[in-house]
């Protein structure tokens, strides 16, 4: 399938949900650009932009191993967007994956139904 612009997929290659998303796009023959947090990092500006489209609570993966490995005191400090962004910059594996940018749209997490609606 040819789209006017290619989606950007942000994630970590060994993440199950990122792999699932990449597989979905490959199956649909949709070309994507993959951004590996571990190699390319993430900017504060990008996280701030994303937080305007989806709340920081959506972007911060509280079910992740990284979140669960934080002490209760560290977790309790994350009460606002600035604190969440700083944490996501320090430990980018705590960002919910994948994050997909497509034009002005932002999809967070693997959601096949949303993919079907967006990429038709």
Predicted regions and their residues:
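Short, flexible turn/loop "capping" segments at secondary-structure junctions
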Residues: 1-2, 92
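Local sequence-structure signature of Cys/Sec-based thiol-disulfide redox active-site neighborhoods
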Residues: 2-28, 32-37
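Thiol/selenol-based redox catalytic cores and closely related redox-interacting motifs
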Residues: 37-120
């Amino acid at each position: 399938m040819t789209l006017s612009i290619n989606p950007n997929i942000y994630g970590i290659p060994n993440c199950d949900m990122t792999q699932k998303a990449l597989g979905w796009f490959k199956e649909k023959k949709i070309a994507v650009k993959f951004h590996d947090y571990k190699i390319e990092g993430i900017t504060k500006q990008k996280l701030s932009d994303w937080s305007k489209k989806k709340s920081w609570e959506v972007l911060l993966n509280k079910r992740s191993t990284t979140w669960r490995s934080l002490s209760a005191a560290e977790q309790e400090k994350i009460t606002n967007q600035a604190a969440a962004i700083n944490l996501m910059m320090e430990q980018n594996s705590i960002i919910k994956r994948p994050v997909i940018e497509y034009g002005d749209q932002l999809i967070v997490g693997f959601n096949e139904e949303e993919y079907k609606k967006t990429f038709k």
